[in-house]
């Protein structure tokens, strides 16, 4: 795909992705100003908060994409227990899944520490992208995520769901920019591109195993 076509795809996609949450924030802010019950106000506040988060993720994706293109994606390495970041994400996504009692979130953290020297925030970013996708495409069943040691010095992370699954012939395409298998789903189509690039920049490997109607497992080392 030429650079011009990529730019056109970017502009067309972003105009929709920016307008949708902005319209929701503006519209529901107006409704909240005239709301009379606390229940009504809470509902509007939740919708505004959800769209604020969506807009922030969009801005972060665009910023990271520009850094990738410029070759200046920033990494800050530190020593940490992989289980800590799993539990952090369990708290965050567990609250969100409370709204859908048909889906169970299973965090497969370990009692024994799994110490690693890597870029903690970037690993959280990748897992967050994968968990967001799992939530979007899983209406019933469960979402599992965790990590385990691979050999003596590699840590293997995974996010598995019982969602719609991805056809074999589409599995490579999902890592292309702006690609969305379901056009009706919200999102920029940048999350998996960014995730794969981050993992590769950390010297790791990124993959997917999926079967239509049974779900998907995304994994990286």
How should these model regions be labeled?
Residues 66-77:
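Helix-loop junction within the histidine kinase core
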Residues 27, 166-178:
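Short conserved segment of the HATPase_c
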Residues 76-81, 98, 102-114, 150:
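Conserved catalytic submotifs in the C-terminal HATPase_c
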Residues 50-55, 59:
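Short alpha-helical segment of the dimerization/phosphotransfer core of two-component systems
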Residues 1-32:
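Primarily the dimerization/phosphotransfer
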Residues 203-209:
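Glycine-rich ATP-binding loops of the HATPase_c
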Residues 134-135:
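Short helix-loop "hinge" at the ATP-lid/N-box region of the Bergerat-fold HATPase_c
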């Amino acid at each position: 795909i030429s650079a011009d076509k990529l730019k056109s795809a970017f502009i067309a996609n972003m105009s929709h992705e920016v307008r949708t949450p902005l319209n929701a924030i503006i519209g529901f802010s107006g409704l909240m100003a005239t709301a009379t019950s606390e229940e009504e106000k809470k509902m509007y506040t939740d919708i505004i908060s959800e769209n604020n988060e969506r807009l922030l993720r969009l801005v972060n994706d665009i910023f990271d994409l520009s850094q990738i293109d410029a070759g200046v994606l920033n990494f800050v390495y530190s020593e940490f227990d992989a289980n800590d970041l799993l539990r952090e994400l369990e708290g965050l996504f567990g609250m969100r899944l409370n709204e859908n009692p048909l889906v169970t979130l299973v965090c497969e953290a370990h009692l024994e520490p799994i110490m690693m020297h890597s870029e903690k925030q970037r690993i959280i970013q990748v897992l967050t992208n994968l968990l967001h996708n799992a939530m979007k495409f899983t209406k019933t069943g469960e979402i599992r995520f965790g990590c385990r040691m691979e050999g003596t010095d590699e840590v293997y992370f995974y996010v598995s769901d019982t969602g719609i699954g991805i056809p074999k012939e589409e599995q490579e395409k999902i890592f292309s920019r702006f690609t969305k298998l379901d056009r009706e789903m919200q999102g920029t189509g940048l999350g998996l591109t960014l995730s794969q690039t981050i993992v590769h920049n950390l010297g790791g490997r990124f993959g997917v195993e999926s079967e239509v109607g049974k779900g998907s497992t995304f994994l990286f080392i």
